[in-house]
Amino acid sequence: MLELLAASPAVFIAIAFAFALLIGSFLNVVIYRLPIMMEREWRAQCAELAETAAPELPEGRFNLVVPRSRCPSCGAQITAWQNIPVLSYLMLGGRCAACKAEISARYPVVEFVTALLVAVVAWRFGATWQGLMAIVLTLFLVPITMIDFDRCLIPDSIVLPLLWIGLGMSLWHPQPGADVLFIAPPDAIIGAIAGYLSLWSFYWLFKLVTGKEGMGYGDFKLLGALGAWLGYQYLFTIIIMSAVVGATLGIALIVFRGRDHQVPMPFGPFLAGAGWITMLWGDAIKGFFNLPF
């Protein structure tokens, strides 16, 4: 199958784009619902530990599958055709079919950006096993980025499977000589450990000096997962890229937008973005800037 798709790169890119549009629609559900599910679980656990009454929750199950999506304004159930990625939003004019309330443009944006990122990966790696796994990594990084952006939270239920998939993929090497992905197990293991410990060490050093927390444990796990996928050789590139871009944007927001410097800014999106770029062009970046690692 991959051989047939490899013979028609444009077809593979088109299929990848269409597939990612559908997955992007589901990722919108993950981005919205998973933090709510986690909060409900935490509240129940806190009530159990405090031996108090469990918090009242809406009736019925609430997970990534049920209930079906509804309009947040009127509660009207979203029909199948209204879930068509991007197109349904355009056909409805960005408004609910029932109450005409405005629908956030973020939903089609997430769908389209997810598809665009996957299409770039398909173009870069082609119809190869390396390309398929790069798509998997991309689809994990999208909800990690958005949830951290919204909540300053990186769920273990996403980042830990990403870590273990990366370690598992290092045991499978169908393309000898392929660069970045399908690294040797020692490189993946060292990458995971070094990625976690590097930010963990910085966290405690920063806290010791300033008395403040500079980042969260989810950031450690995310860099560990990226190290498992890409190898320890690319950790320095990811750290430098994410730190420079994050610091530049943070300073710009403070200077030009008056952002309160005491308000924390999530670091996960910068790590995810740097990891994704490194996955595609890591060697070129290291060579251009003459990075030592």
Q: What is each stretch, according to the model?
A:
Residues 1-22, 26, 118, 122, ...:
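Hydrophobic alpha-helical transmembrane segments
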Residues 25-38, 80, 200-209:
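Membrane-water interface of transmembrane alpha-helices
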Residues 33-41, 123-127, 149, 175-178, ...:
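Transmembrane helix-loop junctions in multipass membrane proteins, especially transporters and channels
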Residues 32-106:
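Membrane-proximal soluble regions of multi-pass membrane proteins
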Residues 21, 25, 29, 119, ...:
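Transmembrane alpha-helical segments of multi-pass membrane transport proteins and ion-pumping complexes
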Residues 104-111, 156:
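Select subsegments of transmembrane alpha-helices in polytopic membrane proteins
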Residues 216-218, 251-277:
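Interfacial loop-to-transmembrane junctions
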Residues 4, 16, 130-245, 287-293:
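Functional transmembrane core segments of multi-pass inner-membrane proteins
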